[in-house]
Amino acid sequence: MGASKYMQELWRKKQSDVMRFLLRVRCWQYRQLSALHRAPRPTRPDKARRLGYKAKQGYVIYRVRVRRGGRKRPVPKGATYGKPVHHGVNQLKFARSLQSIAEERAGRHCGGLRVLNSYWVGEDSTYKFFEVILIDTFHKAIRRNPDMQWITKAVHKHREMRGLTSAGKKSRGLGKGHKFHLTIGGSRRAAWRRRNTLQLHRYR
């Protein structure tokens, strides 16, 4: 078993004594740092490489701390101004995952970089920690690499804001297989519109 496969198997057993100790120590370490900071190298090199990371110039890793829990509706003094059915303020759940929020915060902070992907590195009772892979699209090592030239195009600016990363697509219900039948046609709205539109063709 190679080193990468060995690490992968270690991370699969997060309840083992070794991983429980490591994750506890790392969570303590991450809590002492700022909510968003650059990591010198990926904590999970095997996972980062599976998501597209390479240990070469132009690739950057940022670690993000996101507070766990639901999302309170941002209204002054709970005044929602509407029907009682929409008066909810506290028990609301955000439509997107905490991972996609972490990607968005990293993308906002590093406006000149492109978000490629992200992965989980730890959590405690209050926070979740993610590492985000960002790419410097103006670096020659990226622009000259045929495998990564796609992300240098302008259409991929701030893809994390538009739900185009893996974590963003998950909350949009996009994917392959029987689990994702609600979004056949591109989105939930497109699928709903097609199923709820009566088409009376001229020749039928």
From Swiss-Prot:
The keyword Ribonucleoprotein applies. GO terms for biological process: cytoplasmic translation. GO terms for cellular component: cytosolic large ribosomal subunit. Keywords: Cytoplasm, Ribonucleoprotein, Ribosomal protein. SUPFAM superfamilies: Ribosomal proteins S24e, L23 and L15e. It is found in: Cytoplasm. Pfam families: Ribosomal_L15e. One of its GO terms (molecular function) is RNA binding. Its main location: cytoplasm. The keyword Membrane does not apply. PANTHER family: LARGE RIBOSOMAL SUBUNIT PROTEIN EL15, RIBOSOMAL PROTEIN L15. NCBIfam families: PRK04243.1 (NF003269). Component of the large ribosomal subunit. The ribosome is a large ribonucleoprotein complex responsible for the synthesis of proteins in the cell. Component of the large ribosomal subunit. Belongs to the eukaryotic ribosomal protein eL15 family. This is Large ribosomal subunit protein eL15. It comes from Silurus meridionalis (Southern catfish).
